[in-house]
Amino acid sequence: MKSFPLIFAIFLTQASANQEEIITKLQTLDWKKEATAYAIADDKATITTSENDFLVIGEQASEYMFIMQGHKNYKPDAAILRVQGPEVDSQVIYTINEIGYLTQDDWGENIDKDQMLKDIIEGTIETNKQRGEGYLDLFVDSWAQEPFLNKKNNTVYWAIAGHDAGDNKFINAKALKLGREGYTEILWIGSPEQFTSSETALEPILANYDYSEGFQYADYIPGQDSVAAAGVGALVYKLATGKAAAKAGILAAAAIFAKKFWLIIFLPFVYGWKWIKKKLTKNKE
């Protein structure tokens, strides 16, 4: 059976679940509101928050996704909600993936940007058929920024522009921060007005995210550490489209499919979130 990326909506339509019930559930989560550094993923990385942020970690982040999505297919390590400041209403989702050290030498041969966009558009339409009642259909319009690899900071960036069935427009900017044991997928969700480029949107987020000592990309030990079955180019193609890159090789492609890397998460900015955020910030000290 053909696999497609899973595309998720960040909030339910007014015809769906009761908003007060959602608020009650969200208020029971263990929101970290103090501006400080928080360890995640068994101390393998640290997120430093500002006074503008609410943070949930581990199982609480997974529960947040379940409350907002109605399923348990996506389990991040952390999620940040911007409750004030210049990026108010934007959100950041962090997921650490331990797949082994990723080499960068396959980037050029596996990144076909035009074909990738076509596959993303088709996959999103197909996924809409699987969406539960009360969730808005999503549509991808274009690259907001084509995928590129910054070898200086060992990070891949790309961004998608789209809209939902209510004609609310959104941008999803993604960074893959490479580490010794794999990568961290960092997803920024906001409005087109807040977006200039993936690097600009994600730069302060990446500056406040650090692998712990011993887990950084430069800490890799050749001949000792595990190496991923595919390079970063094949991985990005898979993450973006739900398909294996043609040049990745049969064994590498099989490994990617076995680990279900094709889950791509779209959490579009919608204006119903402002109402939820207002309720939550009543308790912010």
Please state what every model-predicted region is.
Residues 1-7, 262-264:
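Sec-dependent signal peptide recognition
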Residues 8-17, 274:
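Hydrophobic h-region of N-terminal signal peptides that target proteins for export
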Residues 19-36:
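Short N-terminal segments immediately surrounding and downstream of signal-peptide cleavage
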Residues 35-38, 43-112, 116, 161, ...:
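Secretory pathway targeting signatures of secreted, lumenal, and periplasmic proteins
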Residues 38-42, 122, 126, 149-152, ...:
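Acidic/polar residues at beta-strand termini and the immediately following turn/coil
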Residues 57, 120-135, 206, 210-213:
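Sec/Tat-exported extracytoplasmic proteins
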Residues 84-93, 134-223:
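Short, well-structured beta-strand
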Residues 228-285:
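C-terminal single-pass membrane-anchor helix
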